[in-house]
């Protein structure tokens, strides 16, 4: 079968550098799980290295042409190709009560959404590793005080330890993207339960960063906080000045004020 043609509307950029594919596969620790799901395998440059590992590898791919190519060229994937959109797929069809890692050279147009979906299933996903646009990979790992620190940074780091691993040139893709790429990894924290209401925590973080240049006193007005709470000095800060731990404290204060999630 001929090679798959990259489709712009799917954000496809096929990695052609074998050493980088192997390096991404090798970021997996293989600890605490024996199942791996690769998102957007394309023509399988990363898949071939995953299939050599002592884990049960499945792939999920929305592009029917890629699905056909994988079926022809990777017989080991027989019955392990999920022809679906990861963002809509019912993960528990395959992984109910199972721990599994996620890996991929992620489609750039949905990479942030892939992370948010991973957070939804964090009880089942101890490890997440892969390639993003460089700025997205950096944002996930960013610490407070940076202009790129935001919703994705705080929510990911609330449940996972994040690590930016290495930068990848535009020249190792077909077609080459317009920006550099970055590989990062998330490892679920040993204790990843929050000492505050999780739903309210998500609401506070998202609401705060929707008006990131304003102080929390102004950006969180819609939560109808009491005047007494709004006098707390934490509300003098802007959202990018708060660490993950400080967002948890902020949520606890808001909970104590009687605000429900």
Curated annotation (Swiss-Prot):
PROSITE patterns (alphabetical): SAM_RNA_A_N6_MT
Major subcellular location class: cytoplasm
EC number: 2.1.1.182
Pfam families reported in the protein's UniProt record: RrnaAD
InterPro entries in alphabetical order: KsgA/Erm, rRNA_Ade_diMease-like_C, rRNA_Ade_methylase_Trfase_N, rRNA_adenine_dimethylase, SAM-dependent_MTases_sf
Binding site for S-adenosyl-L-methionine: 13, 15, 40, 61, 85, 105
Cellular location(s): Cytoplasm
Catalytic reaction annotation: adenosine(1518)/adenosine(1519) in 16S rRNA + 4 S-adenosyl-L-methionine = N(6)-dimethyladenosine(1518)/N(6)-dimethyladenosine(1519) in 16S rRNA + 4 S-adenosyl-L-homocysteine + 4 H(+)
Enzyme class: transferase
Keywords: Cytoplasm, Methyltransferase, RNA-binding, rRNA processing, S-adenosyl-L-methionine, Transferase
GO MF term set: 16S rRNA (adenine(1518)-N(6)/adenine(1519)-N(6))-dimethyltransferase activity; RNA binding
Any one cellular-component term (Gene Ontology): cytosol
Purpose of the protein: Specifically dimethylates two adjacent adenosines (A1518 and A1519) in the loop of a conserved hairpin near the 3'-end of 16S rRNA in the 30S particle. May play a critical role in biogenesis of 30S subunits.
Family classification: Belongs to the class I-like SAM-binding methyltransferase superfamily. rRNA adenine N(6)-methyltransferase family. RsmA subfamily.
HAMAP family: 16SrRNA_methyltr_A
Entries under PANTHER family matching the protein: DIMETHYLADENOSINE TRANSFERASE (PTHR11727), DIMETHYLADENOSINE TRANSFERASE-RELATED (PTHR11727:SF7)
Protein name, per record: Ribosomal RNA small subunit methyltransferase A
Organism lineage string: Bacteria, Pseudomonadati, Bacteroidota, Flavobacteriia, Flavobacteriales
